[in-house]
């Protein structure tokens, strides 16, 4: 068998090298994620596993810090801390070096399905390609795409340079790919392919179709503000597909979402989520955190911003003059009638203690905060929460959470979602609040979707609660009736802030999604001008291209820099869909 290995770039995936034949089943067993000259369906699980392996790692190492879910406790100089907007080269490369590899494999998978005359597997490949290339372009902006895909399929290695497509053109093609995928899966007579090849959906084409159309809703929302501002809301596509009105198409998808079927069926419940499995028993299926020591795992602390949003707290000022929020236990913590205070039922699923670390502290101030007796228990233990981890691998002791003392595991979970079902409710709530979908443009319409999104997110994260549990019901009422949105209760004027703040919470551990929403809308409102904030107090708008691109792509790379980055590979230029007046003005509030 020929084993396909897609090499590092012009992009890592642009060349395809063929290794010698492999005849030993033992060798295949040692590396089940190498891609062989096998049926197209054999590509599915290796690509999905490696993609999610990368994205959960990116969330913990980058997104969690940029989006103020967490704060680094490393005692290095503050100028090198990611949450202070100083991005090291290795972090800049993360998405590029991993997802381009898998995108190249998806290109190969698609070609295989064409050669097999297998439209259903072509559709699955198109969905995977769309998922991957949107993550790549959302991270960097303009990137190699069309020519790069052609190079993947070439047998020679004479050409290394490839054009950088504009993000707008990439999104045109993504919409066409998702339309084509939906069309092919709508007419396929096959119900399944091999479950062995697909550990996400067990080979069920219907669920792949629902995932593809759910991704379509995300894609439309991603570009809608820009297309409306730039093109009056209509995006031209290719010769096959007519121009798409983003608001009208979102309305069409919403009707299908509401009905659970139709021409664009989408996820119906959390059971339809794309859950990628991991295993502690198989070394080829370990999470990226499997061998992480307690010391390294605990370098990520919960941010004070997140604590103040999710829990009932008192604002305090410590002896060093640092403002922070101190948790006030609710009646659910002591399991008896009490103050009636409420707390987010998801908090326990993420953090082991209930106080947070303020963002953007200078290194000395951060060290003093963590070392201060004011922020420790009587036993001398820090009150600042770290991520839940299930079992401590060094001691074998199961570690419990902050509020209920339950056991959750983020370090070595059995599966992680690529996309949450709850995201759809937030997408359509936003579309309703913006007046893009008339049937839900009234306050009650998008409020119900907001409440449904919050409820579904709680159920996605906390297996110990049910919809009608008092803790869930009272928290939901608090989200609507509490003065949580710029000091006001939920109303039509602050609806976008409310919807997108709760969407931010719901996107915990989902790759780069909350970072994309922030750049697109400016929500949640995040303070970006703290004492240690770098990058001119601008939360990074993109990741820089890898430093070796000038060497690997000497013609196209400088052209891309000059075309849209002003000649400088920077973290401050907006990608195409984020460059709107509304987004800029909302993000500016964080520096005021």
Model-derived segments and spans:
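Bacterial Sec-dependent N-terminal signal peptides
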Residues: 1-30
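Membrane-proximal, proline-rich intrinsically disordered regions
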Residues: 22-70, 90, 97-100, 108, ...
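Structured, solvent-exposed acidic/aromatic patches
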Residues: 38, 73-128, 132-461, 489-494, ...
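Long amphipathic alpha-helical coiled-coil segments
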Residues: 190-195, 515, 526-527
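Bacterial extracytoplasmic/cell-wall-associated proteins, especially those involved in peptidoglycan
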Residues: 342, 348, 500, 510-514, ...
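C-terminal structural cap/anchor segments
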Residues: 434-519
